[in-house]
């Protein structure tokens, strides 16, 4: 999306001390795609896991420590609308500025992305393979970090997103 392009360009050009990636906890898997793109820039980053209250009301159980371990990042649960967790987020920003961490899981993912970039000639095929690999990675870590109720109710917005963001059905 245009927002993702602008975000990535800003981070590359301005070289911030730390990137605060605000992630919607209720739609964690969808948001991890951008998170992985930002991580590929190798900049210090913190995840502000916003709307954690909404995710909990939906019956989602997020293993924050496991998410931190998999991504090598501090993950701070917040409810921005009620100013909950914001002080902890500010403290994390101060302590994490300038620090990058890498995990074996992430390194393996980035190595596989590099392999695709080095071996696949067609730009379109390269992007498709990288996208597939990214979704596979998200799915693999999601099983360790996210538990959802079996009978989860989907909102109209969720159903629209499933079609619009589908790699085969989405409008290019």
Regions found by a protein language model. Name each.
Residues 24, 79-82, 166:
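Acidic/polar residues at beta-strand termini and the immediately following turn/coil
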Residues 46-47, 56-151:
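Alpha-helical transmembrane helix bundles of large polytopic membrane transport and channel proteins
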Residues 148-162:
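Pre-Walker A segment
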Residues 159-172:
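Hydrophobic alpha-helical transmembrane segments
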Residues 39, 133, 163-165:
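Core structural elements
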Residues 2-76:
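Conserved C-terminal guanine-recognition region of P-loop GTPase G domains, centered on the G4
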């Amino acid at each position: 999306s245009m927002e993702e392009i602008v975000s990535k360009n800003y981070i590359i050009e301005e070289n911030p001390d730390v990137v605060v990636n605000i992630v919607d906890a209720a739609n964690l898997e969808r948001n991890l795609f951008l998170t992985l793109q930002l991580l590929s820039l190798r900049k210090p980053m913190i995840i502000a896991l916003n709307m954690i209250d909404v995710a909990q009301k939906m019956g989602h159980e997020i293993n924050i420590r496991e998410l931190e371990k998999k991504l090598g990042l501090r993950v701070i649960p917040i409810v921005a609308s009620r100013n909950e967790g914001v002080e902890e987020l500010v403290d994390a920003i101060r302590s994490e500025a300038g620090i990058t961490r890498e995990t074996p899981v992430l390194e393996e993912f980035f190595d596989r992305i590099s392999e695709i970039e080095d071996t696949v000639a067609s730009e379109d095929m390269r992007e498709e393979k990288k996208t597939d690999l990214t979704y596979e990675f998200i799915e693999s870590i999601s099983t360790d970090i996210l538990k959802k109720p079996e009978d989860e109710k989907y909102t109209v917005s969720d159903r629209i997103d499933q079609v619009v963001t589908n790699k085969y059905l989405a409008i290019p």
